[in-house]
Every structure is written in structure tokens, then in C-alpha cells.
């Protein structure tokens, strides 16, 4: 008799987790992203909440969001190439997941005893930006995988890349390629050089710590330029 409450509890927890994960198979909707632009993302809202709870908000300073939506054709081919080469070189070939990269990340996480390395594709990063926070957990990764799968079913690769390049974080309050190009180089994303594009691309893994003029960005962008197609 004593085991029944434990079994009931386990059943309840399992059912709750299954429902919590399962709802992502149908909600939130994805199809509207084919023709409409998201006004904000869960990640942007997360950053704003961080700001509101931080020291600068206490000084009465509001977080300024810099973002200007542009179609993919108005983003320099060099930046598109740089981001794909740096972040997800199999982007045009996979269906949302790079299983070899995921295995390597899983192995590194296992060796470190914590969830550190990501191994995420551009599609996975877009799903995370749109609907989730940076929380690192197995449960969130499963939800992210479901939303990535749905993105790949609903949208073509060009649209996925366009969305990603318009919502990716490129600094404190700087989102999207157009805002990043204007903020750091004083020009439109359409007019970026190969060198400028490479510097922006290697900022993406750590946009709050890296700037185009930092030593690590110069070093990494130099390596990236050698890998980028001409």
C-alpha cells in the first residue's frame, strides 16, 4: 500500500512532463513566420528582464533595443557566408540537426559534468531565440528540438537564415545584421566587406563580450576568412 502514493506521484510527474513537451508539437504556431516578421523574441524579453533587474535600470536608464528588419537580399552575401561557415557549415544540407556536432557537444558536456557546449545549428539557435531563454536543461533541449523540426517543415532555408540574421544578438541591445552593421561600422548590412562580415560572424557565440576590435575577434575572423568561399 505504501508504494501506491509513490507510483501515483511518478505517474503524475511523467504525465505532466509528457504533456509539457507534447504541446510543442502544435503550439506555438510556426506557419505565420513564413510571411510575417516577429516583433520580439523570448530571448529579447529575457535580456530586457535582465536589464530591469540590473544596476543600470536602478539609475533610471531604459534598455535601448536597436533592430531594423531587412530582407535577406539586403544582407551582404559575405555576411551570409560568414555566419553559415562559422556557425553551421552544413546548414544548406541538414534538416535542422547536425548529429555529428551534437555528439561532440554531448561528449564535451559529459566530460565536464555539466551542459556547457551547445552544438546547435542555425535552425536550433533560431528556435531558441524565438521561444526560449538560455536555460540549460535536457527538457528545454527536447522542446527546442521539436520547434526546430517544425521550423524546418514550415520554412525554407532562405527564410530560416533571414529570420536568424534579423533576430540574432550582436551586442547589448543590438539585434539583427542591419543594426549590427550600423552600430559597429556605420553602414548598411548590404555594404559590409568580407572582413567586416567575418568579424560580425565570430561575435555571435559571445556577443556581449566580443567586439569587432577585440583581439580574439581579429584572430578568429582571420581564420574564418580562410575558410569562407570566394
Regions found by a protein language model. Give the residues of each.
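Juxtamembrane regions of bacterial inner-membrane/periplasmic proteins
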Residues: 1-230
Amino acid at each position: 500500500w505504501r508504494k501506491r502514493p509513490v507510483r501515483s506521484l511518478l505517474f503524475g510527474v511523467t504525465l505532466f512532463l509528457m504533456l509539457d513537451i507534447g504541446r510543442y508539437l502544435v503550439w506555438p504556431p510556426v506557419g505565420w513566420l513564413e510571411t510575417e516578421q516577429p516583433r520580439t523574441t523570448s530571448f529579447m524579453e529575457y535580456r530586457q528582464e535582465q536589464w530591469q533587474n540590473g544596476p543600470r535600470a536602478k539609475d533610471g536608464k531604459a534598455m535601448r533595443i536597436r533592430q531594423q528588419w531587412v530582407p535577406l537580399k539586403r544582407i551582404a552575401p559575405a555576411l551570409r557566408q560568414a555566419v553559415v561557415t562559422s556557425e553551421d557549415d552544413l546548414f544548406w544540407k541538414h534538416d535542422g540537426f547536425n548529429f555529428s556536432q551534437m555528439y561532440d557537444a554531448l561528449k564535451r558536456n559529459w566530460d565536464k559534468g555539466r551542459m556547457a557546449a551547445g552544438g546547435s545549428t542555425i535552425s536550433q539557435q533560431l528556435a531558441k531565440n524565438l521561444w526560449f531563454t538560455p536555460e540549460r536543461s535536457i527538457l528545454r533541449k527536447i522542446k527546442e528540438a521539436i520547434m526546430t523540426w517544425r521550423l524546418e517543415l514550415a520554412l525554407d532555408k532562405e527564410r530560416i537564415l533571414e529570420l536568424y540574421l534579423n533576430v540574432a544578438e550582436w551586442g547589448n541591445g543590438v539585434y539583427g545584421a542591419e543594426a549590427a552593421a550600423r552600430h559597429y561600422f556605420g553602414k548598411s548590412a548590404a555594404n559590409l566587406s568580407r572582413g567586416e562580415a567575418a568579424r560580425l560572424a565570430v561575435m555571435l557565440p559571445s556577443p556581449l563580450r566580443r567586439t569587432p576590435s577585440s583581439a580574439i575577434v581579429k584572430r578568429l575572423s582571420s581564420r574564418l576568412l580562410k575558410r569562407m568561399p570566394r
